[in-house]
């Protein structure tokens, strides 16, 4: 085979017999390709092992034939827009190994995984609390309320919840995990769903209020956002209970 043919071969599944033949090929170009291939395989094997480790909490419930939902939120810190939460129930055979804490993934990867999670999950639900609710009951309680709405919106009722660092105000057994989106695939999937949903929502608000650059800042207090607040005052989606916003109320 030519070097190009071997390069193409190593992009897919390779049998042990083929690998033995390539290892016996003394061409430097072939050996370089083999080294790169083996590094990729080792990296993938590590990713698969870590992915399986992130099912350790789920397996405790699966062993008892129980359904468990991962719950996470995004948007506690922004000055504008809602806090968005998601609840996700994953099947035992869930195999999207790239699913991880949404903060560790690029926007492109999150958007790529979003529809795949929706397609493979047993059930997915989104809950949100808008700025009026946040201003009325505070961000922490609004977050908990939105989480409850997300869980209640699931088409299948879970037997238990895995929650990222919060307690959901529902009478369902739950495990609170600090940095849960890095420890549980169910929470990680929920973090991706919530993040992409909120980003899409803030993109839409960016069309309505272009001066505030919501498409790029998602409601966070960037320099451009603060300059627009100073010049134009708050929009109907701003959180007036947040100090920087109230200072620019006209």
From Swiss-Prot:
Domain RNase H type-2: 66-250
EC class of the enzyme, as a word: hydrolase
PROSITE patterns linked to this entry: RNASE_H_2
GO process annotations (BP): DNA replication, removal of RNA primer; mismatch repair
E.C. code: 3.1.26.4
Catalytic activity: Endonucleolytic cleavage to 5'-phosphomonoester
Gene Ontology cellular component terms for the protein in this record: cytoplasm; ribonuclease H2 complex
Subcellular location: Cytoplasm
Protein's UniProt keywords contain Transferase: no
Binding residues for a divalent metal cation: 72-73, 164
Cofactor binding, per record: Manganese or magnesium. Binds 1 divalent metal ion per monomer in the absence of substrate. May bind a second metal ion after substrate binding.
CC cofactor: Mn(2+); Mg(2+)
Keywords: Cytoplasm, Endonuclease, Hydrolase, Manganese, Metal-binding, Nuclease
GO function terms (MF aspect): manganese ion binding; RNA binding; RNA-DNA hybrid ribonuclease activity
Main location: cytoplasm
Family: Belongs to the RNase HII family.
Function statement: Endonuclease that specifically degrades the RNA of RNA-DNA hybrids.
Name the UniProt record assigns to this protein: Ribonuclease HII
Organism from which the protein derives: Lactobacillus gasseri (strain ATCC 33323 / DSM 20243 / BCRC 14619 / CIP 102991 / JCM 1131 / KCTC 3163 / NCIMB 11718 / NCTC 13722 / AM63)
């Amino acid at each position: 085979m030519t070097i190009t043919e071997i390069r193409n071969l190593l992009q897919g599944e390779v049998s042990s017999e083929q690998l033995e033949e390539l290892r016996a090929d003394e061409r430097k170009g072939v050996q370089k390709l083999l080294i790169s291939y083996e590094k990729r395989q080792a990296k993938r094997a590590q990713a698969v092992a870590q992915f399986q480790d992130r099912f350790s909490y789920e397996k405790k419930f699966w062993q008892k034939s129980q359904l468990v939902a991962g719950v996470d939120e995004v948007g506690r810190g922004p000055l504008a827009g809602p806090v968005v939460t998601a609840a996700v129930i994953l099947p035992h055979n869930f195999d999207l190994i790239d699913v991880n804490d949404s903060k560790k993934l690029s926007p492109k990867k999150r958007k790529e995984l979003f529809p795949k999670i929706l397609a493979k999950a047993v059930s997915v639900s989104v809950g949100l609390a808008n700025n009026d609710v946040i201003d009325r009951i505070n961000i922490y309680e609004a977050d908990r309320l939105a989480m409850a709405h997300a869980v209640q919106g699931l088409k299948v009722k879970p037997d238990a919840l895995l929650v990222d660092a919060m307690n959901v105000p529902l009478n369902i057994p739950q495990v609170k995990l600090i940095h849960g989106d890095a420890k549980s695939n169910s929470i990680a999937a929920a973090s991706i769903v919530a993040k992409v949903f909120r980003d899409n929502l803030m993109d839409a608000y960016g069309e309505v209020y272009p001066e505030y650059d919501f498409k790029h800042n998602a409601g966070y207090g960037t320099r451009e956002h603060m300059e627009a607040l100073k010049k134009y005052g708050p929009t109907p989606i701003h959180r007036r209970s947040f100090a920087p916003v109230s200072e620019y109320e006209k």
